[in-house]
């Protein structure tokens, strides 16, 4: 990555997208 902040934001957005698209039936899995 050329820009660290861009990298971090990219990873965070990807993680958030995964959480949002994660099946709600598995509530508690990977959730604090």
UniProtKB/Swiss-Prot annotation:
InterPro entries named among the record's database cross-references: Calcitonin, Calcitonin/adrenomedullin, Calcitonin_CS, Calcitonin_peptide-like
Parts of the chain that traverse the membrane: none
Disulfide bonds listed in the record: 1-7
Gene Ontology terms, MF aspect: hormone activity
Residues where Proline amide is found: 32
Pfam families referenced in this protein's UniProt entry, alphabetically: Calc_CGRP_IAPP
One of the record's GO cellular component terms: extracellular region
This protein's UniProt keywords: Amidation, Disulfide bond, Hormone, Secreted
Cellular localisation: Secreted
Keyword flag Disulfide bond: yes
Biological function: Causes a rapid but short-lived drop in the level of calcium and phosphate in blood by promoting the incorporation of those ions in the bones.
Family, as annotated: Belongs to the calcitonin family.
Name this protein carries in UniProt: Calcitonin-2
